[in-house]
């Protein structure tokens, strides 16, 4: 080591690096700003069209017809709140502490904030401290805990020229190191930057509705102008009436009702899951989970409890019985600085008086797979993997491994401990085997079996030994436990090729976890990922839906879609049920909403076509006004579908939501179109007044809508019958109330119009039943 490194950087060198921007000051921010979120949810084509219609209605002072705009505002507000919450969630993510760093500059040791470090700074790190920046060891020795970053539960030995990763911790020892990377180039910074990418909202229902809105958005302006000019110039209606009638057609084409119900249903699902101790941090993830067909599990904390415990201690020599073994382990763990889960389990089991003072200690290393300690009056005690310490295989160790346990051997030597060149001594004697077990979660087997029955594929992705993971998976009832691979021994290309067919992935790095998820998504799967460590973050962010345990690392909780507050994997099916309930029920009642979209479009086309025929008596003006549609919606699209979305429905989600819903809505929409054409022509031939025609059409429109409500309520139950009675009764009560009649611009069915209504509804009911049965068969 040269003098410059011992002295550290000079103030001049520090200023030069600061001027060059080589400073450890980096904040990983989300890619989406608050303004971008607001803009994305407010300044949309859908909102712009509704706003333009609202302005037109306000301009002609048609105040009673502006009720619809409250729905638009609520939709935009819900979208903003949902995305802001997701942004806030990832903004909080931070893998680094803010503790002062001992830094050598101009030969003096000073305490600096991590963000004040520059490239080339010499820093001194001791046990228990976090590494503030990627650095190379200049002198000293340390055991580093990289579990938070890499998933490796064992400590990693770092000697001269070893690379220290930012975000990891020194478990033992002390080192003098030189900053190798700063700011965005640091390992932890790159990890945070990837994790802080705000994923776009993934809702197939909303995307389907956006497609529909996109289509209507392209035609709505020319349609609106044509309808307005037709009513104003050709039919000679007043400006207010022309605007109101034209607006009704345009509003009917925009699917705002089902968009509102979707958001409301998801919000209720969030509340229900919250009552069941499941925190939903991203509303649309409920829908996504309902569509999941590939669930990737982390072994620790998911299938197992994540709580290591000593299952058994098996003495291997008559010289040292169980009491002697316990005394040695008690002394060893009392002096040991090892903090990995296995050491903690042994320490918890063996407590008491320390019989042997410590002379020297060599911490456990994941490279060596063993640790050692020289104890006064005993010798050098070794604790580690049997295959690394013993020359021959111990049958009992193999049996324990096949049971899914971690096995350690306690051994003794009389040779002195060499810290500079640690190696296995020639006179080593095995004293005992320790079987360490991470218990299977109660109910895990039933949960896995149920998920399989629901057509959900399962994969286990773990940083542990694949043989151990396979054994644990077998005990948990995992069907494909025999299909596993050691990811530390294959390339990325090989991993991508094996991702679809392999069930268990062991020794997986954070990058490989993400790659597995990406490969599965490219294969067409909707993926969910469970995890609890920082090493899972990249995969959790990549998955369509991320689920973490509340007992997991705080960083994973901050970026997860769902957090299991009870840290119980067995809650996953309940979340699946809730998602399927929402998605299936929305698909079930969607035709009720799409009837209006279809008939509004068809009637608008007919109205425009009628103006091109050249005869004034054939010109058709859109027959409804916004307040009429709004009132009918209360009893057709409002309360009944809302109540029906709460019913249990856990069948697998069907594809092609929009296409199937449109086909189911088409017969009813055609009935409305036929009603308008027939009543207009027949009424004119019979000399009916516009009020009589408007009244009959109002009743027909409401009644055709009720046919779809009846279908949605089948098979009938007491509550569903009461729902139908409330809807039909509410519709009739408002239609017969004089004040409301005036507002709706209708009256009561007369002796001339009532029989026509009865005959038409009888025919429509028969047609509706026949078409519904035909569609059900298909």
Curated annotation (Swiss-Prot):
Q: Where are the transmembrane segments?
A: 38-57, 65-84, 210-229, 243-260, 587-606, 625-645, 664-684, 690-708, 717-739, 758-777
**Enzyme Commission (EC) number:** 7.2.2.-
Question: What InterPro entries does the annotation carry?
Answer: ATPase_P-typ_cyto_dom_N, ATPase_P-typ_P_site, ATPase_P-typ_TM_dom_sf, ATPase_P-typ_transduc_dom_A_sf, HAD-like_sf, HAD_sf, P_typ_ATPase, P_typ_ATPase_HD_dom
Q: Where in the cell is it found?
A: Cell membrane
Q: Which GO terms describe its molecular function?
A: ATP binding; ATP hydrolysis activity; metal ion binding
Catalytic activities:
ATP + H2O = ADP + phosphate + H(+)
Q: Name one Pfam family in it.
A: E1-E2_ATPase
Show which residues sit on the Cytoplasmic side of the membrane.
Answer: 1-37, 85-209, 261-586, 646-663, 709-716, 778
Annotated positions binding Mg(2+): 532, 536
The record gives the membrane topology as: Multi-pass membrane protein
Q: Does the keyword Transmembrane helix apply?
A: yes
State the UniProt keywords alphabetically.
Answer: ATP-binding, Cell membrane, Magnesium, Membrane, Metal-binding, Nucleotide-binding, Phosphoprotein, Translocase, Transmembrane, Transmembrane helix
- The keyword Phosphoprotein is assigned to this record: yes
Stretches of the chain found on the membrane's Extracellular side: 58-64, 230-242, 607-624, 685-689, 740-757
Sorted alphabetically, which PANTHER family does this protein's record hold?
Answer: CALCIUM-TRANSPORTING ATPASE
Q: Protein name, please?
A: Probable cation-transporting ATPase exp7
Source organism per UniProt: Streptococcus pneumoniae serotype 4 (strain ATCC BAA-334 / TIGR4)
